[in-house]
């Protein structure tokens, strides 16, 4: 974060102008008394910048908003929170932005493909944005362009965890034009430019005169949101805003590069308007400078790394650094071009591509345009690069190999039709991936909720306990497409995961055969029969399958020699720290700040019965916000089994029980202490820790019960 060392008055803007350490110094002709006054204000700014005000807002609300947790889901409307004084706060009735584009450090924002934006002065601190983490993937900066401290960065891989923030498509020149494009009518009836920012600087919590320092920066656990009002639209190519007086999260060192969002009234969506540049204090009020999104600069970098080839339905061969375009089958010579490593090859208008060598594109990928079909043949040769980006309604028939020493990143809404066993891992962000061979990929990682894996052959997934498929935040869809599939556990971290069968003529059996307690957080729908059968002569009470997502099928569910629970899901919230406090010598390192924060909010939690807000847990039995799980099926067949319906479950279907026990309205419930964080090891492993306790909520069952023996 740039500290603003000098301010001066601008007749053009009618306000104070910040001059950062990166900008030209204030002119020597400036009145000395004015400069001295502004300097003292700027120095005071470093004191006032100690950031998250929890005097009337729970600390967790700032984190939940930036991390899209709790009530702050992307697109949510009419969101209100209860303040510590009992009042309601409504965020000016704004919808909630999708902050998934924010890197874990908060100092950069993905904008799609292999690109992100930040500020140029972050290069001084490698922790900020030189390596960017999204969920379980790390990306490295390979090139950049900057102007006026705004920086566009090129990464070494296509980012799969997010489609990225939508960049602002226009840059109004005046405040009145900006007010027209981005202004909203606030609760007091006036029209203002109100927005959000998400970042993770050197976080401290302020309660009156008390300050709780975390001694932490760039922590994803502490990614927090600010609510602001733009007060000046153009100040040396930047905009200036001030923070909300109630929901008050002041920017501080480490917040540089974090993204600022405004609602675009024309596009009817949130857009990224710039990145955080610096701060200053004026009359005791902190102001923040945002360097505006520079579309021209972004386009220049993208053009530098794009090599466009119009196939127009023809053939192309690639060998080493040579790419040869054949206008037709009779054209054996073709037209030859040189390709440059680290550039993206952009194919248009459909056609055929033949690899004649092992290809290493470095940080370059292959991009296919919209609405066409492409055939890729490798003749046993391999491709390696940033990934594959397929446009809407395009299909790429992939009859080549991806390098086994790398991970294929697939983005774009189009379809990758994989026709060969790859012997590699894949990470999927968008679109369809069709599997046509047994064990097509070693492991599959689905992120963002926009991708789908379609089985087109029996055993096309892996054969380990997770079947080699892992669903991280917001997950994605697995379409069984008429094929049976067995799991010991499904590695899904939240309800963004859906397992379906789109084949309406052929039932698919989804078998989950866990022999220890396990919670599946996702959804099951379509033409699926769900089974949980343990091969044993005795009932395995430990083999408990807990469903806290949803089931919607017209088919049967079958449980033998095991236990099944259907319940709702305790909504996940942000935590303050995911690792334990390793300091045991209080006299050396002081009291654990997480404990201090909990104690600071304890009186309010006692008043509102809200200990769950400060307990540093993602989920709690006593929290009031449980999602209702809806479970619909034809008949549940129980054989030597236990079945229970716990809190916040709505179950519709008949039950046929043989030597089995049924509990409707079970007082016991289950939570996953790692919910939302289950996926580990670069995306290809799964952990779960389950707790059970008394927790009572509404239960509903509709159907008939037939019991035998």
Specify the residue positions occupied by each region the protein language model found:
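Glycine- and acidic-residue-biased ligand/ion/polar-headgroup-sensing regions
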Residues: 321, 414, 428-436, 449-451, ...
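C-terminal subregion of chymotrypsin/trypsin-like serine protease catalytic domains
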Residues: 50-81, 106-122, 145, 215-245, ...
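Terminal peptide-recognition signature
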Residues: 14, 114, 118, 153, ...
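Chymotrypsin/trypsin-fold serine protease catalytic domain
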Residues: 150-250, 254
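Solvent-exposed adhesion/ligand-recognition segments of exported proteins
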Residues: 4-30, 44-49, 299-382, 550, ...
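Acidic/polar low-complexity surface segments
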Residues: 455, 495-497, 566-632
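Extracellular, surface-exposed repeat architectures
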Residues: 349-420, 457-550, 614-709
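Catalytic histidine site
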Residues: 77, 81-138
């Amino acid at each position: 974060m740039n500290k603003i060392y000098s301010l001066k008055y601008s007749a053009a803007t009618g306000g104070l102008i910040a001059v950062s350490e990166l900008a030209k110094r204030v002119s020597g002709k400036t009145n000395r008394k004015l400069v001295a006054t502004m300097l003292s204000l700027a120095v005071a700014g470093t004191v006032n910048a100690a950031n998250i005000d929890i005097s009337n807002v729970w600390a967790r609300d700032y984190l939940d908003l930036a991390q899209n947790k709790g009530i702050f889901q992307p697109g949510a409307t009419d969101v209100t929170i209860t303040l510590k004084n009992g009042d309601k706060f409504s965020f000016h009735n704004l919808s909630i932005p999708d902050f998934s584009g924010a890197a874990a450090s908060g100092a950069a924002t993905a904008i799609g493909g292999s690109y992100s934006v930040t500020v140029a002065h972050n290069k001084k601190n490698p922790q900020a944005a030189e390596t960017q983490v999204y969920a379980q993937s790390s990306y490295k900066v390979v090139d950049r362009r900057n102007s006026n401290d705004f920086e566009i960065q090129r990464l070494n891989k296509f980012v799969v965890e997010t489609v990225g923030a939508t960049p602002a498509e226009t840059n109004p020149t005046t405040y009145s034009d900006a007010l027209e494009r981005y202004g909203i009518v606030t609760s007091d009836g006036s029209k203002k430019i109100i927005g959000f920012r998400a970042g993770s600087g050197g976080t401290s919590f302020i309660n009156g005169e008390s300050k709780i320092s975390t001694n932490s920066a760039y922590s994803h656990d502490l990614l927090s949101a600010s609510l602001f009002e733009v007060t000046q639209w153009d100040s040396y190519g930047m905009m200036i805003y001030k923070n909300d007086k109630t929901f008050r999260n002041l920017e501080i060192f480490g917040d540089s590069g974090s993204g600022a969002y405004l609602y675009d009234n024309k596009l009817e969506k949130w857009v990224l308007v710039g990145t955080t540049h610096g701060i200053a204090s004026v009359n005791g009020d902190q102001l923040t400078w945002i360097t505006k999104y520079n579309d021209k600069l972004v386009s220049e970098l993208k053009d530098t790394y794009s090599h466009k080839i119009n196939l127009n339905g023809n053939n192309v061969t690639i060998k080493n650094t040579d790419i040869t375009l054949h206008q037709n089958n009779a054209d054996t010579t073709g037209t030859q071009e040189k390709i440059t490593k680290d550039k993206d090859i952009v194919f248009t208008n459909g056609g055929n591509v033949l690899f004649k060598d092992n290809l290493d594109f470095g940080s370059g990928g292959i991009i296919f345009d919209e609405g066409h079909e492409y055939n890729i043949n490798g003749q046993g040769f391999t491709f390696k690069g940033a990934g594959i980006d397929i446009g809407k309604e395009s299909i790429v028939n992939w009859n080549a190999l991806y390098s086994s020493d790398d991970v294929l990143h697939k983005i774009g809404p189009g379809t990758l039709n994989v026709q060969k066993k790859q012997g590699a891992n894949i990470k999927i962000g968008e679109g369809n991936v069709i599997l046509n061979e047994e064990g097509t990929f070693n492991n599959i990682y689905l992120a963002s909720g926009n991708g789908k894996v379609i089985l087109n052959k029996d055993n096309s997934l892996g054969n380990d306990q997770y079947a080699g498929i892992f669903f991280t935040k917001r997950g994605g869809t697995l379409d069984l497409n008429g094929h049976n599939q067995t799991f010991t556990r499904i590695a899904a971290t939240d309800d963004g995961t859906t397992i379906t069968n789109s084949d309406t003529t052929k039932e698919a059996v989804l078998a989950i055969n866990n022999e220890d307690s396990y919670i599946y957080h996702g959804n099951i729908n379509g033409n699926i029969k769900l089974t949980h059968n343990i091969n044993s002569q005795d009932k395995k009470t430990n083999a408990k399958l807990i469903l806290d997502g949803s089931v919607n099928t017209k088919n049967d569910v079958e449980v033998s020699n095991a236990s099944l629970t259907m319940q709702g899901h305790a909504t996940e919230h942000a935590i303050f720290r995911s690792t334990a406090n390793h300091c045991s010598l209080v006299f050396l390192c002081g009291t654990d700040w997480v404990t201090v924060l909990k104690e600071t909010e304890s009186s309010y939690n006692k008043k509102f019965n809200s200990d769950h807000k400060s307990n540093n847990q993602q989920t709690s039995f006593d929290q009031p916000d449980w999602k209702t799980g809806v479970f619909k099926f034809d008949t549940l067949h129980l054989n030597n089994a236990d079945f229970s319906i716990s809190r916040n479950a709505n179950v519709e279907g008949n039950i046929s029980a043989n030597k089995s026990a049924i509990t409707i309205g079970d007082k016991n419930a289950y939570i996953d202490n790692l919910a939302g964080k289950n996926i580990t090891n670069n995306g290809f492993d799964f952990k779960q820790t389950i707790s059970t306790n008394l927790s009572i909520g509404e239960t509903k069952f509709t159907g008939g019960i037939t019991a035998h023996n």
